[in-house]
Amino acid sequence: MFTRLITTSALTGAIALTIGSQAFAQTELAWWHGMTGANNEMVNELSKEFNESQSEYKIVPVYKGNYPETLNAGIAAFRSKQPPAILQVFDAGSGVMMAAEGAIVPAAEVLEKGGYKFDKSQYLPGIVAYYSKPDGTMLSFPYNSSSPILYYNKDAFKKAGLDENKPPKTWPEVFEAAKKIKASGASPCGFTSTWLTWIQTENFAAWNNVPYGTNENGLAGTDVKLEINSPLYVEHFQAIADLAKDGTFRYGGRTSEAKQLFTSGECAMLTESSGGLGDVVKSGINYGIGQLPYYEGHGPQNTIPGGASLWVFAGLSDDQYKGIAEFFNFLSQTKIQVKLHEKSGYLPVTLAAYEETKKSDFYEKNPGRETPILQMMGKEPTENSKGVRLVNLPQVRDILNEEFEAMLGGKQDAKTALDNAVKRGNAAIAAAQ
């Protein structure tokens, strides 16, 4: 995928580590990740395929817990001077990594160390921009980028008297369908959602073209004041809180736990990452895909990337950097990207892979599978929809989750929850400056 350079840049400023004294000794590269289920199987499959394609380097995938746990493990390992070669960091952790100058080596630089030239024009623009510095330098490699979508149980829709081939498009339509599903007994629960922070606040802002925070949600400056207690957010979360009172909406957890409520048949609708598709398919449920719901008069605008990217620490050996470059080049190959996209639901990060998938009529044969790509690429981003970048976004998400959980537990209404989240979140952001 990348262009091979005639000369390879020498490693500068890194601490050389001894890998082995024997000539042609294989260099092991630990890849710490947070993938489970079908996505963990894909990590193992790709690692095995790369290892069998050459003999100099060996990728060793290691599951380190969920996304936040993997990020924390990587930071702790770097501080103890024992970092992995590659660390998978979820979208919310990007600001943390970007702020750690000197601790990481940009992906573009790693590729040059391995003799490759990175050409950002070969990648989906929205993904490249999200993981790059303002000057365009690619900081991390976009392994599994995703967009949130609506999954729905076609059998439950049919039992409830809803059109199984017509998923709801707006949030009011989702809420009405959820009530009808529960009232009819088609499913015990009408609607659930994974990642209330990423989907229902960050992407909610982008998709409905409303501010998440000041300074273009942190992309124009680090001094950010949250704006997630404006009227549209309050209306949206109060509707969810009201549905939760009788179980029409069920809360599964802070990350992807709610996916189990859908794949088990308990809840008939789910907003979740496109990358959750592998487990949905594996469950055997009769599912359909719809675009992320929006509010009339506000959306749809564009979604922002989720999922995760691969980061490389400073202080590795020349051989490790060269091996990582070879692995990134392997992951960029069109056939690998097509496989990752078609099997997992994650986006094809290269334009070549996207075009190849279209040419094969995959999207015609699999309705809805192009939806997450079209959502992200459909419109030119506005200052509200370029993304969210906070140096402590994982911490801010924790604060929001605490307030959402109190709201869903009936301890406070949506306005109180969001007002508290803004007050506490702003204090945390200011303290992190």
From Swiss-Prot:
NCBIfam families referenced in this protein's UniProt entry, alphabetically: PRK10974.1
Function summary: Part of the ABC transporter complex UgpBAEC involved in sn-glycerol-3-phosphate (G3P) import. Binds G3P.
Gene: ugpB
Taxonomic lineage: Bacteria, Pseudomonadati, Pseudomonadota, Alphaproteobacteria, Hyphomicrobiales
Protein name (Swiss-Prot/TrEMBL): sn-glycerol-3-phosphate-binding periplasmic protein UgpB
PANTHER family cross-referenced by the UniProt entry: ARABINOSE-BINDING PROTEIN-RELATED, SN-GLYCEROL-3-PHOSPHATE-BINDING PERIPLASMIC PROTEIN UGPB
InterPro entries documented for this protein: Bact_solute-bd_prot1, SBP
Keyword tags: Periplasm, Signal, Transport
Major site of localization recorded for this protein: periplasm
Ranges annotated as spanning the membrane: none
Record Pfam families: SBP_bac_8 (PF13416)
Positions bound to sn-glycerol 3-phosphate: Y67, D91, S146, S273, G307, Y346, R397
Subunit-level organization: The complex is composed of two ATP-binding proteins (UgpC), two transmembrane proteins (UgpA and UgpE) and a solute-binding protein (UgpB).
Signal peptide interval: 1-25
Family that this chain belongs to: Belongs to the bacterial solute-binding protein 1 family.
GO CC term, one of those recorded: periplasmic space
Localization per Swiss-Prot or TrEMBL: Periplasm
